[in-house]
Amino acid sequence: MFDEFYFRKSLRPRESQNHVRNAACEYILKFMKTEGTIVKTYHLGSSLEPWGRKFHERIDRTVFDQDLTPFVKYTLNKKKRWEAEGNPDILYGLQRSYQNMGVMVAERVSLRSTPHYCIVSINNYYRNFFDQFPIRHLHQLQDHNYQCQSTNSIRGQPFKSLQPENRTPTQVTGHQQESSANVSVAYHIITPPKNYEVLRNKDFRVGHSDRNGIRTIARRRRFQFMKEAVFDLKNEILEDFGDSDDDDENEILLCEESCGPRKFYNLHDHLVKSNHNE
C-alpha cells in the first residue's frame, strides 16, 4: 500500500498532462494557432525562352496580378475565401482565370520556422524558402480532372517525392515526363499542423526561462557549450601565464647560483683616492 502511494505521488505526469512542461511551449508557440500564409508563384517550362526583367514586371502587373501579387506573402486570415482548402471549385475557378496554364494549390507545413521570419540563403531564394515548408496535400487539374496527391506524414514531403514517377516501386529510366503546360500558377498555403504542441513539446525544457532568457533545450545546450569553451580558454591562458612566470623565476635563481657572490666598491671613494694621488 505504501509503495503504491509513493509511486503515484512521486511519478511525473504524462507529457500531455504535464502543464508545467507545456507552459513554455504553449506560451512561445501560441501565435501558431492563428498563423497562416499564402504565397502565389508562377513557374516557366524549360521549352520557353528566358524572359527579361521588364517582361516579368509587365506580366506581374497584368496577367498574374488578378487576385494576389506574385511572390508576396499574405496573411491567410485576411483572405477568408481561402479557408476552403482542397475545394475543387477553387481550382476550376482559377483555371478559368488562367487559360492554357497549369494551376495547382499546395498545402504546406510550417513547423520549425515561420514564413515571415525564415532565414534562408539569398542564392536561389524561393527554392530554399519552399524547401523549409514541405507539402502535405497537392491539388491540381489534369485534363480538367481533379487530382489530389497526399502524404501520410504530418510533417509533409518535398515536391519531388509527390510526383507519380517517383512514387512507383520501379523507376523508369531514360524517360522523363514533361508537363503539358508551359506556364504553371501555384498557390502555396502554409499553415502549422493542428498538433504542433505535441510535435514541438520535446524541444522545450521543464519550467520557465532562466536569467538568460533560455527557454529551449537546444539553446540552453548551445549557451552551456559556449560557457564551457570560454572557461577552458581562460584556464589555458592562466596556465600558460603561470608557467612562464615560474620559468622566469627559475632562470633568475639558476643565474644567481651559477654566477656566485659579486664584488662591489664605492665609486666615490675610488674617485677621492684618485684625486689625492694626482
From Swiss-Prot:
Induction: Induction by P.aeruginosa is dependent on zip-2 but independent of several immunity-related pathways including pmk-1 p38MAPK, dbl-1 TGF-beta, and kgb-1 JNK pathways. Induced, in a zip-2 dependent manner, by translation inhibitors such as cycloheximide and exogenous or P.aeruginosa-derived ToxA. Residues 152-179 are annotated as: Disordered. This is Protein irg-2. Keywords: Immunity, Innate immunity. Residues 163-179 have a biased composition (Polar residues). The lineage of its organism: Eukaryota, Metazoa, Ecdysozoa, Nematoda, Chromadorea. It comes from Caenorhabditis elegans. Plays a role in innate immunity by conferring resistance to virulent strains of the Gram-negative bacterium P.aeruginosa via the zip-2 pathway and independent of the pmk-1 p38MAPK pathway. Induced as part of several immune responses to translational inhibition arising from endocytosis of ToxA during P.aeruginosa infection or exposure to exogenous cycloheximide. The keyword Transcription regulation does not apply. One of its GO terms (biological process) is innate immune response.
